[in-house]
Amino acid sequence: MDHPEDESHSEKQDDEEALARLEEIKKSIEAKLTLRQNNLNPERPDSAYLRTLDSSIKRNTAVIKKLKQINEEQREGLMDDLRGVNLSKFVSEAVTAICEAKLKSSDIQAAVQICSLLHQRYKEFSASLTQGLLKVFFPGKSAEDLEADKNSKAMKKRSTLKLLLELYYVGVIEDSNIFINIIKDLTSVEQLKDRDTTQTNLTLLTSFARQGRIFLGLPISGQDEDFFKGLDVTADQKKSFKKAFNTYYDALADLLQSEHKLLLQMEKENAKLVNAKGELSEDSASSYEKLRKSYDHLYRNISSLAEALDMQPPVMPEDGTTRLTAGDEASPSGTVKDTSVPEPIWDDEDTKTFYECLPDLRAFVPAVLLGEAEPKSNEQSAKAKEKLSESSSEVVENQQTTEDTTEVSADSASMDDRSNAEQPKEKEEVEKEKAKDTKKEKGKEKDSEKKMEHEKEKGKSLDVANFERLLQRLPGCVSRDLIDQLTVEYCYLNSKTNRKKLVKALFNVPRTSLELLAYYSRMVATLASCMKDIPSMLVQMLEDEFNSLVHKKDQMNIETKIRNIRFIGELCKFKIVPAGLVFSCLKACLDEFTHHNIDVACNLLETCGRFLYRSPETTLRMTNMLDILMRLKNVKNLDPRQSTLVENAYYLCKPPERSARISKVRPPLHQYVRKLLFSDLDKDSIANVLKQLRKLPWSECEQYILKCFMKVHKGKYGQIHLIASLTSGLSRHHDEFVVAVVDEVLEEIRVGLELNEYGAQQKRLAHMRFLGELYNYEHVDSSVIFETLYLTLLYGHDTSEQEVLDPPEDFFRVRMVIILLETCGHYFDRGSSKKRLDQFLIHFQRYILSKGHLPLDIEFDLQDLFANLRPNMTRYSTIDEVNAAILQLEEREHASSGDKVSIERHSDTKPSNKSSSDVISSNGKSTAKDIRENGEAHGEESDSDSGSGSVVRDGQNEELDDGNHERGSESGDGDDYDDGDGPGSDDDKFRVRQKVVTVDLEEQADFDQELKALLQESMEQRKLELRGRPALNMTIPMSVFEGSGKDHHHFGRVVGENGEEVLDEENGEQREVQVKVLVKRGNKQQTRQMLIPSDCALVQSTKQKEAAELEEKQDIKRLVLEYNERDEEEANGLGTQILNWTSGGSRGSTRTGEGSGKSGGSRHRFYYHQGGGGSYHARRK
């Protein structure tokens, strides 16, 4: 439990830190106000003052070049340079340089300071700068602009917009109408047609909305409100800005809706293709992934803009195809199998309805169109034929009678003609009219018969086309409603020929479309009630195919065999295939239980084995078959795959008896911890959760809290950083807990690599993300991250288990690396960590290329990763290119390490020691004793005029060597180099490592001779040089330095050639300064001492110059030491990795200790953000 005193102390400390931050914010606002006031009312120097400054072209050109590389580190130096030059004639060049500068977000304030300085000095600078910056948003359509990199142009626009806003806030730019033109161009609806331009404009508008809330009339909270009150933004301008943003946001919402509809349509089409063909083509999958990625990116950007505008993000209607839903967890309470109660045949009501509730065709189709109505129609046609024959015989009789009557009438007529000669003409006319009428009737009958035949032919062709279309729709019927509708439609096209075609189409189902077998079987079962020949023909064809496949005994056509046996099983569940046929097929497979027969038997049992086992009439026989199956499995020496198949089929038919599932009972304290971490934790409640965790009895709950922290995969993926923040918060009070968390995370990552289980992939990704967040909160070092990255790539390789641990087709390790680098890789942008990340990314590319073809999602993630971390890095396309790059990298490292080794060897040899001692003695009167005395001072100023700088450096190095080898400074001049195991042991060490290299003796001798000559020449030259002397503008005779210290005791403080103040020893008052004047008499040069007043301009300028040089040296020395300490912290893991060096072990340990001591504050310094609910820990800055 925490003591109240500790809590009060921590709360007091938090309050003090909050007050300090508020004070810093207040000072920053006051500085901005002062700068704004100076820019609005600039006091520009006159032309006379500007003429006194440096106006040379060379100096101005150098300063303008520096303006192209503005950053925070060079700000002060650049401003000093600008104050010392006259840029009146180079204002346009300075503006161009500033506009071309590649500014980062951290460099914006430095650019504002520099622009303010130029604005306060040159009147025309502000207008020229405004025009130059606006050209970034409204460029001319030249070829270079069109071919420029879109990514770099977007980044340039973003930084320029931020710079314009900041310049407006500080008064360099006073016209706010320029932002109206920019916003109108960005919110143009015409640009929505281009996807890339829309994404770029969205990011720019979001940045403007966040930084320029005053333009949109949005509320401003905090102390910034006083600063923004002074800005002159009219109500009309705010209205114009707000209208442009709202109009553009509405257009974006419509665009997002259309994108969503298009995505849904494509998903539905893909679903149809998958159902019809079983897979998607590469083009379809690629286009879908591209559209999906574009939609997600657009949605994220629109949500960010809505958040910046204080609006609700658009809500898309959810659809089953666009969201992933997790199934409900299994019921915690199970039931024990009771053999006394008969088990249901079907597992659920839907399955029972599918197999038992078939549609009644007589209720949807007229009986005439069904097969059972054919006999009646045949009888009717027979009767009609009889009637037609009877009527035809009657017509023949009538014709005969008419002929007889005509003959009789003709005879009588001839007699009448003879008797009555007056009437022949009238009878002839009547007979002609009758003949014409009969001819007309016969012609009409022929025409009607032709029309009937033509209509019948048209009807037949139309029926054939409709039936072909129906068969084409058959593979797409993947639901109960679709297959039932198709069955009804077929009844309208029923005929004997069509029934044969239908059976053939059902039999030739694609062997890879096994999901269609159940629906085809339902269609057959539905038609079997009216068309008895369809099921009989299909069953006969399936049985013949099974017999032919079994009797061939070849190991071919496994897919055809599985399709055949599963079709038989599905028809068995519809009771179309008798159970005896199924048992005979199963017995045929069990009689020869090898190879494909095992797969066929298992597929048959998986299809209808459970149905037969639970049916009362077949349960006994099925039980016997299952027992035979298990006995054969135990007797046969089956491979693991076949053994698993048999067990799955057996337990699917006859599940084992299991006890009831017992739900886990947790103590209330554990339930409360889980509620805090998995239910209550979010960004608003993190402070309260941290407070509640600290209130818990830590001795009882520590292990369980650690266990829950390790279950980050059971929570939301987006809340992993909150768990890391809680870890950071708890570290202030429980240091050992953080160590345990880091150890557990690293152990879990390694265990995941060792097991490589598919079911643990979500857990492994969550742990990689957690490790990255722990680095962000400064709980692990970069060395841990890089060790984990290399472990992920290399673990298990070059071993016998490589195919199991990291198969060639498995890309999960690539995803793990992507997750870790996406989480914390953006912090590796400087120092040694940047170099190490560059090296790792090259090795990472080799690992990727060794895998083969990448899936689309992995490729897209890799593109995003390299774009975010190293956009300019080369992506290699072949393994040879990346191997060449790695070889070149290793050669560079080997060359650099070889240079270091040679430098250490030559610096530790005796000739170099001798030459250094000669140089010291030649420069002045310093000896080895003086070196030791000065070396112990660690940088104190020497009273000697000669060689002070070199003596101090050598003394520092000597002290480090003394500390490393545990020796004092009592030894003589050469003891520091000859005693101990210093350089000699290093040299021996390198020789041992190089024994494997075979060197030609003649070449080695030539090399040693040339090296010796080179060193001798270098030493001869160094003897004549003056070391540690201040550089003068003239050559000074050696006689000057020989007697430079004669009168040291007469004055309190004496200076050589530069001159220093001379103090009287008695009263210590400042008198005069002693200098030496070089004169020439004849051919001889002599020096004479001269006293000049201390307030003279020469003395004052000399003193200022020396003081500035000394301060610069101290700053450079401090910066170099700090950089070395930070570099060693990153490389050595904060002092936890002790390097066992033989010659410099103590030095490494000493510096590591210092680095860790200094970095301890930075590593365990946590930042707090004040919120409504308290404070929580933020990530590294």
UniProtKB/Swiss-Prot annotation:
Keywords: Coiled coil, Cytoplasm, Nonsense-mediated mRNA decay, Nucleus, Plant defense, Repeat, RNA-binding
Protein name (record): Regulator of nonsense transcripts UPF2
Encoding gene, per UniProt annotation: UPF2
Annotated coiled-coil segments of the chain: 6-41, 260-309, 425-451, 539-559, 1000-1021
Biased composition (Basic and acidic residues): 375-389, 415-459, 893-911, 927-941
Region (Interaction with UPF1): 999-1023, 1066-1111
PANTHER family, A to Z: NONSENSE-MEDIATED MRNA DECAY PROTEIN 2 UP-FRAMESHIFT SUPPRESSOR 2, REGULATOR OF NONSENSE TRANSCRIPTS 2
Record's signal peptide: none
